[in-house]
Protein backbone atom coordinates (compact mmCIF):
# COMPACT_ATOMS: atom_id res chain seq x y z
CA UNK A 1 0.00 0.00 0.00
CA UNK A 2 1.37 3.38 -1.04
CA UNK A 3 1.36 6.76 0.68
CA UNK A 4 0.62 9.75 -1.54
CA UNK A 5 1.12 13.20 -0.09
CA UNK A 6 -0.70 16.08 -1.80
CA UNK A 7 1.02 19.45 -1.57
CA UNK A 8 -1.66 22.09 -2.11
CA UNK A 9 -2.23 24.99 0.25
CA UNK A 10 1.29 25.74 1.44
CA UNK A 11 4.27 27.91 0.59
CA UNK A 12 7.02 26.78 -1.76
CA UNK A 13 9.45 27.03 1.14
CA UNK A 14 7.43 24.59 3.24
CA UNK A 15 6.86 22.25 0.29
CA UNK A 16 10.58 22.09 -0.42
CA UNK A 17 11.39 21.66 3.27
CA UNK A 18 9.05 18.68 3.63
CA UNK A 19 10.49 17.04 0.53
CA UNK A 20 14.03 17.49 1.83
CA UNK A 21 13.23 15.66 5.07
CA UNK A 22 10.73 13.06 3.86
CA UNK A 23 11.04 12.41 0.11
CA UNK A 24 12.31 8.89 0.83
CA UNK A 25 9.11 8.06 2.75
CA UNK A 26 6.61 9.42 0.21
CA UNK A 27 5.63 6.88 -2.43
CA UNK A 28 3.82 9.40 -4.65
CA UNK A 29 4.53 13.12 -4.44
CA UNK A 30 1.47 15.08 -5.54
CA UNK A 31 1.99 18.57 -6.91
CA UNK A 32 -1.53 19.67 -6.08
CA UNK A 33 -4.06 21.81 -7.90
CA UNK A 34 -3.36 24.93 -5.84
CA UNK A 35 0.38 24.51 -6.40
CA UNK A 36 -0.21 24.28 -10.15
CA UNK A 37 -2.27 27.49 -10.06
CA UNK A 38 0.01 29.44 -7.73
CA UNK A 39 3.45 28.30 -8.81
CA UNK A 40 2.96 26.86 -12.29
CA UNK A 41 4.71 23.85 -13.76
CA UNK A 42 8.19 25.35 -13.57
CA UNK A 43 8.51 24.37 -9.93
CA UNK A 44 7.46 20.84 -10.83
CA UNK A 45 10.43 20.80 -13.22
CA UNK A 46 12.69 21.86 -10.37
CA UNK A 47 11.37 19.05 -8.17
CA UNK A 48 11.99 16.56 -10.96
CA UNK A 49 15.55 17.80 -11.42
CA UNK A 50 16.26 17.60 -7.69
CA UNK A 51 14.56 14.22 -7.18
CA UNK A 52 14.96 12.30 -10.45
CA UNK A 53 13.71 9.03 -8.93
CA UNK A 54 10.61 10.43 -7.24
CA UNK A 55 7.18 9.31 -8.44
CA UNK A 56 5.54 12.65 -9.26
CA UNK A 57 1.83 13.19 -9.77
CA UNK A 58 0.52 16.54 -10.96
CA UNK A 59 -3.13 17.37 -10.27
CA UNK A 60 -4.47 19.84 -12.87
CA UNK A 61 -7.91 18.21 -12.68
CA UNK A 62 -8.24 18.31 -16.46
CA UNK A 63 -11.67 19.21 -17.79
CA UNK A 64 -10.80 20.90 -21.10
CA UNK A 65 -7.86 21.07 -23.53
CA UNK A 66 -6.83 17.58 -22.36
CA UNK A 67 -4.03 16.92 -24.82
CA UNK A 68 -2.29 20.27 -24.35
CA UNK A 69 -2.49 20.20 -20.57
CA UNK A 70 -1.44 16.56 -20.26
CA UNK A 71 1.49 17.06 -22.61
CA UNK A 72 2.66 20.10 -20.61
CA UNK A 73 2.45 18.10 -17.38
CA UNK A 74 4.41 15.13 -18.68
CA UNK A 75 7.04 17.34 -20.29
CA UNK A 76 7.43 19.12 -16.94
CA UNK A 77 8.34 15.88 -15.20
CA UNK A 78 5.06 14.31 -14.11
CA UNK A 79 4.79 10.52 -13.99
CA UNK A 80 1.03 10.69 -13.40
CA UNK A 81 -1.50 13.32 -14.48
CA UNK A 82 -5.10 13.71 -13.31
CA UNK A 83 -8.28 14.15 -15.31
CA UNK A 84 -11.83 14.47 -13.99
CA UNK A 85 -14.28 11.69 -14.79
CA UNK A 86 -17.03 14.31 -15.18
CA UNK A 87 -15.13 15.66 -18.19
CA UNK A 88 -16.42 12.60 -20.05
CA UNK A 89 -14.85 9.43 -21.37
CA UNK A 90 -13.65 11.01 -24.63
CA UNK A 91 -11.70 13.67 -22.75
CA UNK A 92 -10.26 11.10 -20.35
CA UNK A 93 -9.17 8.90 -23.24
CA UNK A 94 -7.34 11.81 -24.86
CA UNK A 95 -5.28 12.18 -21.70
CA UNK A 96 -4.63 8.43 -21.66
CA UNK A 97 -3.38 8.54 -25.25
CA UNK A 98 -0.92 11.31 -24.41
CA UNK A 99 0.23 9.36 -21.35
CA UNK A 100 0.95 6.32 -23.50
CA UNK A 101 2.93 8.50 -25.89
CA UNK A 102 5.21 9.49 -23.02
CA UNK A 103 5.19 6.13 -21.25
CA UNK A 104 3.38 7.70 -18.27
CA UNK A 105 0.19 7.10 -16.28
CA UNK A 106 -3.22 8.69 -15.68
CA UNK A 107 -5.33 9.04 -12.57
CA UNK A 108 -9.04 9.67 -13.13
CA UNK A 109 -10.63 11.59 -10.27
CA UNK A 110 -14.24 10.56 -9.56
CA UNK A 111 -14.98 13.68 -7.51
CA UNK A 112 -18.62 14.81 -7.94
CA UNK A 113 -19.38 12.06 -10.46
CA UNK A 114 -23.14 11.44 -10.32
CA UNK A 115 -22.79 7.75 -11.20
CA UNK A 116 -19.36 6.84 -9.83
CA UNK A 117 -19.81 3.07 -9.75
CA UNK A 118 -20.78 2.72 -13.41
CA UNK A 119 -18.22 5.33 -14.41
CA UNK A 120 -15.48 3.49 -12.53
CA UNK A 121 -16.41 0.23 -14.24
CA UNK A 122 -16.19 1.84 -17.70
CA UNK A 123 -12.90 3.57 -16.91
CA UNK A 124 -11.44 0.34 -15.59
CA UNK A 125 -12.46 -1.48 -18.76
CA UNK A 126 -10.89 1.32 -20.83
CA UNK A 127 -7.51 0.68 -19.24
CA UNK A 128 -6.88 3.66 -16.98
CA UNK A 129 -4.05 3.28 -14.48
CA UNK A 130 -5.57 4.86 -11.37
CA UNK A 131 -9.08 5.69 -10.21
CA UNK A 132 -9.43 8.08 -7.28
CA UNK A 133 -12.44 7.98 -4.97
CA UNK A 134 -12.48 11.46 -3.56
CA UNK A 135 -14.55 13.68 -1.29
CA UNK A 136 -13.74 17.38 -1.52
CA UNK A 137 -12.50 19.62 1.29
CA UNK A 138 -15.96 21.22 1.40
CA UNK A 139 -17.66 17.82 1.79
CA UNK A 140 -17.45 16.41 5.30
CA UNK A 141 -18.60 12.93 4.24
CA UNK A 142 -16.04 10.14 4.18
CA UNK A 143 -15.26 8.63 0.77
CA UNK A 144 -15.03 5.18 2.37
CA UNK A 145 -18.51 3.82 1.59
CA UNK A 146 -18.29 4.89 -2.04
CA UNK A 147 -14.82 3.36 -2.25
CA UNK A 148 -16.07 -0.01 -1.01
CA UNK A 149 -18.83 -0.07 -3.64
CA UNK A 150 -16.46 0.91 -6.44
CA UNK A 151 -13.95 -1.71 -5.33
CA UNK A 152 -16.53 -4.39 -6.14
CA UNK A 153 -16.60 -3.50 -9.86
CA UNK A 154 -12.98 -2.50 -10.55
CA UNK A 155 -10.76 -5.36 -11.70
CA UNK A 156 -7.51 -3.82 -12.95
CA UNK A 157 -7.08 -0.13 -12.11
CA UNK A 158 -5.22 0.91 -8.98
CA UNK A 159 -7.75 2.40 -6.56
CA UNK A 160 -6.87 5.53 -4.62
CA UNK A 161 -8.79 7.16 -1.80
CA UNK A 162 -8.69 10.82 -0.75
CA UNK A 163 -10.59 13.23 1.43
CA UNK A 164 -10.37 13.92 5.15
CA UNK A 165 -7.86 11.15 5.90
CA UNK A 166 -6.03 11.63 9.18
CA UNK A 167 -4.21 9.61 11.81
CA UNK A 168 -7.54 9.26 13.60
CA UNK A 169 -9.21 7.30 10.79
CA UNK A 170 -6.25 5.84 8.90
CA UNK A 171 -6.71 2.27 10.17
CA UNK A 172 -10.30 2.11 8.92
CA UNK A 173 -9.19 3.45 5.54
CA UNK A 174 -6.32 0.98 5.26
CA UNK A 175 -8.61 -1.97 6.00
CA UNK A 176 -10.67 -1.05 2.92
CA UNK A 177 -7.67 -2.06 0.82
CA UNK A 178 -6.83 0.86 -1.49
CA UNK A 179 -3.69 0.78 -3.62
CA UNK A 180 -2.70 4.18 -2.30
CA UNK A 181 -3.92 6.56 0.36
CA UNK A 182 -3.82 10.29 -0.31
CA UNK A 183 -3.20 12.70 2.55
CA UNK A 184 -2.47 16.41 2.47
CA UNK A 185 -3.34 19.06 5.02
CA UNK A 186 -2.98 16.61 7.90
CA UNK A 187 0.71 16.51 6.94
CA UNK A 188 1.64 20.02 5.88
CA UNK A 189 -0.49 21.85 8.47
CA UNK A 190 1.23 19.98 11.28
CA UNK A 191 4.18 21.51 13.11
CA UNK A 192 6.17 18.34 12.45
CA UNK A 193 5.26 17.03 8.96
CA UNK A 194 8.01 14.41 9.00
CA UNK A 195 6.65 12.86 12.20
CA UNK A 196 3.14 12.68 10.71
CA UNK A 197 4.44 11.07 7.51
CA UNK A 198 6.38 8.53 9.58
CA UNK A 199 3.24 7.71 11.59
CA UNK A 200 1.17 7.25 8.43
CA UNK A 201 3.80 4.88 7.07
CA UNK A 202 3.76 2.90 10.31
CA UNK A 203 -0.02 2.45 10.08
CA UNK A 204 0.27 1.30 6.48
CA UNK A 205 2.85 -1.29 7.51
CA UNK A 206 0.80 -2.53 10.48
CA UNK A 207 -2.29 -3.10 8.42
CA UNK A 208 -0.79 -4.64 5.26
Q: Which residues make up each language-model segment?
A:
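Conserved N-terminal beta1-alpha1 strand-loop-helix module at the mouth
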Residues: 1-67, 75, 116, 167, ...
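Catalytic beta/alpha-barrel core
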Residues: 8, 28-37, 55-63, 79-90, ...
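Glycine/Thr-rich beta-alpha phosphate-binding loop at enzyme active sites
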Residues: 34, 119-149, 195-196
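Helix C-cap/helix->beta junction micro-motif
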Residues: 51-54, 102, 154-157
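Catalytic cores of alpha/beta
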Residues: 64-76, 114-126, 154-155, 165-183
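Expand to "…catalyze enediolate/carbanion chemistry for C-C bond making/breaking, isomerization
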Residues: 74, 80-82, 97, 101-110, ...
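Glycine-rich phosphate-binding active-site loops on the catalytic face of alpha/beta enzymes
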Residues: 78-90, 131-141, 176-200
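C-terminal helical cap(s) of enzyme catalytic domains, especially alpha/beta-barrels
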Residues: 95, 99, 150, 174, ...
Amino acid sequence: MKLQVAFDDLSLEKLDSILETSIQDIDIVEYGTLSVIRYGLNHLKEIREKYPNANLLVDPKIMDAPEKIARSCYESGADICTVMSVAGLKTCLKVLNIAKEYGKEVMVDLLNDLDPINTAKKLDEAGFDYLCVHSSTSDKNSPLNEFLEIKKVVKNAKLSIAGGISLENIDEIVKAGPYNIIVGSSVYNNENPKLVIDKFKEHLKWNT
